[in-house]
Amino acid sequence: MAVGKNKGLSKGGKKGGKKKVVDPFSRKDWYDVKAPNMFQTRQIGKTLVNRTQGQRIASDYLKGRVFEVSLADLQKDIDPERSFRKFRLIAEDVQDRNVLCNFHGMDLTTDKYRSMVKKWQTLIEAIVEAKTIDGYLLRVFCIGFTAKDQQSQRKTCYAQQSQVRKIRARMTDIITNEVSGADLKQLVNKLALDSIAKDIEKSCQRIYPLHDVYIRKVKVLKKPRFDVSKLLELHGDGGGKSVEAVVSSEGAVIDRPEGYEPPVQEAV
């Protein structure tokens, strides 16, 4: 016979008793997601993150999140020409309860892209890599379709391969010039207005008439080194926070945003 107390009986309860239910949302905080000042809608939504606990800092889990928003929502416009464009914004910094985002790419909705592909016409696509003035390396995808002549009785409107090569070369030249001659803010404004695609369509009319010319997708391949002052300048008001000057021990002036928290040191 075993000598000792039976812990299960001494507690007077059943093994595996009722556990206290903890609401997981009680450990989370809401943050406002802010778009750059090139868009009319500055607050595009809210996002959740676990509250800061010890070494686990909430802002570290917010940085790098990507938000996909329709251009119609960003510009407060119900124009159908804007609704099928999706802009991707990436969280780069956190100021107080504001998540400051920057441009991370653009794409067309799947239904719009598939509705353009039809029979009896030639699809022409160009893929261009170019760098902006401020150091962003972008890959731009352009798409266009040959248009039928209204006076022609033919069912088809196929272009010759020599014409396709000329149109693709013209697309490449225009996109390269537009991207390399502008900074990121100016380029985003051009993408929102679709001015690059309109220039391509107008320039290629002499080679072969085109229709449904769009910048189909934009990818950000490489970014310059992160600078918080440039991000605050891109947001105008800096997400509601001002920048204050801090004097270091050497006497140099350092610009730090209000509410700046120094990183946690692993060792002293």
UniProtKB/Swiss-Prot annotation:
Superkingdom per UniProt: Eukaryota
SMART domains: Ribosomal_S3Ae
GO cellular component, one term: cytosolic small ribosomal subunit
UniProt-listed GO biological process terms: oogenesis; translation
Annotated signal sequence range: none
Keywords (A to Z) from UniProt: Cytoplasm, Developmental protein, Differentiation, Oogenesis, Ribonucleoprotein, Ribosomal protein
GO molecular function: structural constituent of ribosome
Subcellular location: Cytoplasm
Major location (coarse): cytoplasm
Region spans: Disordered: 1-21
HAMAP family in the cross-refs: Ribosomal_eS1_euk
Subunit architecture: Component of the small ribosomal subunit. Mature ribosomes consist of a small (40S) and a large (60S) subunit. The 40S subunit contains about 33 different proteins and 1 molecule of RNA (18S). The 60S subunit contains about 49 different proteins and 3 molecules of RNA (28S, 5.8S and 5S).
Function: Essential for oogenesis; required for late follicle cell development.
Family: Belongs to the eukaryotic ribosomal protein eS1 family.
UniProt-recorded name of the protein: Small ribosomal subunit protein eS1
Organism in which the protein naturally occurs: Drosophila sechellia
Name of the gene this protein is made from: RpS3A
